[in-house]
Every structure is written in structure tokens, then in C-alpha cells.
Swiss-Prot record:
Residues bearing PTM Phosphoserine: 124
Xref: InterPro entries: Exosome_cplx_N_dom, Exosome_RNA_bind1/RRP40/RRP4, KH_dom_type_1, KH_dom_type_1_sf, NA-bd_OB-fold, RRP4_S1
GO biological process, one term: poly(A)-dependent snoRNA 3'-end processing
Key word Ribosomal protein present: no
Function: Non-catalytic component of the RNA exosome complex which has 3'->5' exoribonuclease activity and participates in a multitude of cellular RNA processing and degradation events. In the nucleus, the RNA exosome complex is involved in proper maturation of stable RNA species such as rRNA, snRNA and snoRNA, in the elimination of RNA processing by-products and non-coding 'pervasive' transcripts, such as antisense RNA species and promoter-upstream transcripts (PROMPTs), and of mRNAs with processing defects, thereby limiting or excluding their export to the cytoplasm.
Keywords, comma-separated and alphabetical: Cytoplasm, Exosome, Nucleus, Phosphoprotein, RNA-binding, rRNA processing
Pfam families named in the record: ECR1_N, KH_6, RRP4_S1
Binding partners and assembly: Component of the RNA exosome core complex (Exo-9), composed of EXOSC1, EXOSC2, EXOSC3, EXOSC4, EXOSC5, EXOSC6, EXOSC7, EXOSC8 and EXOSC9; within the complex interacts with EXOSC4 and EXOSC7. The catalytically inactive RNA exosome core complex (Exo-9) associates with the catalytic subunit EXOSC10/RRP6. Exo-9 may associate with DIS3 to form the nucleolar exosome complex, or DIS3L to form the cytoplasmic exosome complex. Exo-9 is formed by a hexameric base ring consisting of the heterodimers EXOSC4-EXOSC9, EXOSC5-EXOSC8 and EXOSC6-EXOSC7, and a cap ring consisting of EXOSC1, EXOSC2 and EXOSC3.
The organism of origin for this protein: Bos taurus
Name of the protein described by the UniProt record: Exosome complex component RRP4
GO molecular function terms attached to this record: RNA binding
Top-rank taxon, per record: Eukaryota
């Protein structure tokens, strides 16, 4: 196995211009946002000497007279309707604890999920005893945020057939602030793989199924070997997502696909080299700018 090691002095510094939005007002803790007293103080700010000062590093967002700072690197703050990817950490009475990259563990109630086969009925004691047969510790799931409690904890549900247990694939963890909010977060890419872009920063990359298992009730038990071609596509997509996240570019289906196409001249293992990563991301950014016109 070939290994490549570089000394810190030999590494090329990444371009600071990449991943930065010129239109956004970036601040660090202690920066003065405004001296106008007509604005309301929001999250990530505080008043000091009649000035509105940032308390976290991030971008300034204004809604009418409300000013807040959205942190660039933070834990996931759940919102109703968000699509998330999570990992089961504990099986409890009539519920599962799920790790979703938030400050507190999320909760998936037994009554908030589809039974295998999509059967609709009241949950019985037999269902409660068979909970570990449905989902056990370590299983990955896709779900939707049903409610957010006062302490910030999130309640999930998987009642739709497109949610449920995930099969074979690769999990990539990025900052939640890099995942662009869209109408749908389930994408079948033309390269032969699919992605689930969780609003919580967990991205699931998996081979596109030949037929949709709508009758499985959200439970995927496909354990057939994945072909070498599919594994190479998934590995390339994974490295492209890591490259975009390293350069602080927003992640959505178009940016990931453009980055994948830009990486095709290079070997999969070389994509994460700093100079190649910068070249690929610059080409991706240029194509996105041309598309926007």
C-alpha cells in the first residue's frame, strides 16, 4: 500500500477566496455589527456600549429589524420538516434514541414509524417486544423532524415510505451550515449513485436501487454485494463531498454532481490532495457561476 506524507512547510496553503461569499457579512466574536439603536438583538449577538456586538463567528442575517449571527460551525438545531440522517444509539421503552449531530439525542417513538410492510394499526405489546428487531443499536435511518421541544431535543417520525432504515452505503459528516435547504433532499444522480442530504450534516451516499421498495414499509434489507463500479462511484462522490466541505462550499445535488464531473480526470485517492482539491472546487465554482448567469 502506497502512502504519501507531506511536511507542513511543503503543503500548499489553500486559497482563502474559495468558499467565501462576498455578499455575506462575516464577523468574529467582538466585532461591532452596527451602532444603530433601531435594530433588535437576536441569537449570537449582545449589546455593549450602545453597540450591537457579535458573540459567535458566523454570517450576519437580518429579518426586518432583527439581527442575528448564524454560526459557521455549530451543532444541528432542529426545525420542523427537516430531513435528517441519524444513528440509533439506544432502544428504550416505546422509543429509540437517535444521534443526529444535535446537542441532545433525538427521539423516535414506536408510534411514529411504519411497521414492516407498511401495515397501519395500533402498536401492541408484541410490537414493543420486537423493537430491536425493527431497529437496533448502530442502525442508520432517514427521518423527518416532527417536533422540537423547549430544551432543543428533536422528535422524529418515519411514517412516509421514503424514510426508514438505510442499507448499504457511506456516511459523510459535514457541518450542518453547509447543507443547502431545498424542496427535496433525496437525489438520484446520473452517475449511478444516490444521496440523502440531511439537514443535520449527515450525508448518506448509496448505490441507486434498480426498483423502489415501496412495499417494504421503510425497511431496506438489501445485503447483496455492491459491484466494484458502484463502490468506485460512491468513493469518488464521498471524496468530492469532503472536498466541497473543506472549501466551505454549499452542498446540494448540482454542486456535488459538478464536482464529481470535474474529478473524473483524477484518481479517487488523489482527489483529497490539496492542489487537486483546489483545482476541482475552482472548476465547480466556475460552472455554478456560469449557470447562475
Amino acid at each position: 500500500m502506497a502512502l504519501e506524507m507531506r511536511l507542513p512547510v511543503a503543503r500548499k496553503p489553500l486559497s482563502e477566496s474559495l468558499g467565501r461569499e462576498s455578499k455575506k457579512h462575516l464577523v468574529v466574536p467582538g466585532d461591532t455589527i452596527t451602532t444603530d439603536t433601531g435594530f433588535m438583538r437576536g441569537h449570537g449577538t449582545y449589546m455593549g456600549e450602545e453597540k450591537l456586538i457579535a458573540s459567535v463567528a458566523g454570517s450576519v442575517e437580518r429579518v426586518n429589524k432583527l439581527i442575528c449571527v448564524k454560526a459557521l460551525k455549530t451543532r444541528y438545531n432542529g426545525e420542523v420538516g427537516d430531513i435528517v440522517v441519524g444513528r440509533i444509539t439506544e432502544v428504550q421503552q416505546k422509543r429509540w434514541k437517535v444521534e443526529t449531530n444535535s446537542r441532545l439525542d433525538s427521539v423516535l417513538l414506536l408510534s411514529s414509524m411504519n411497521l414492516p410492510g407498511g401495515e397501519l394499526r395500533r402498536r401492541s405489546a408484541e410490537d414493543e417486544l420486537a423493537m430491536r428487531g425493527f431497529l437496533q443499536e448502530g442502525d442508520l435511518i432517514s427521518a423527518e423532524v416532527q417536533a422540537v421541544f423547549s430544551d432543543g431535543a428533536v422528535s422524529l417520525h418515519t411514517r412516509s415510505l421514503k424514510y426508514g432504515k438505510l442499507g448499504q452505503g457511506v456516511l459523510v459528516q459535514v457541518s450542518p451550515s453547509l447543507v443547502k435547504r431545498q424542496k427535496t433532499h433525496f437525489h438520484d444522480l446520473p452517475c449511478g449513485a444516490s444521496v440523502i442530504l440531511g439537514n443535520n450534516g449527515f450525508i448518506w451516499v448509496y448505490p441507486t436501487p434498480e426498483h423502489k421498495e415501496d412495499d417494504a414499509g421503510g425497511f431496506i434489507a438489501n445485503l447483496e454485494p455492491v459491484s466494484l463500479t458502484d463502490r468506485e462511484v460512491i468513493s469518488r462522490l464521498r471524496n468530492c463531498i469532503v472536498s466541497l466541505a473543506t472549501q466551505r462550499m454549499m452542498l446540494y445535488d448540482t454542486s456535488i454532481l459538478y464536482c464529481y464531473e470535474a474529478s473524473l480526470p483524477h484518481q479517487i485517492k488523489d482527489i483529497l490532495k490539496p492542489e487537486i482539491m483546489e483545482e476541482i472546487v475552482m472548476e465547480t465554482r466556475q460552472r455554478l457561476l456560469e449557470q447562475e448567469g
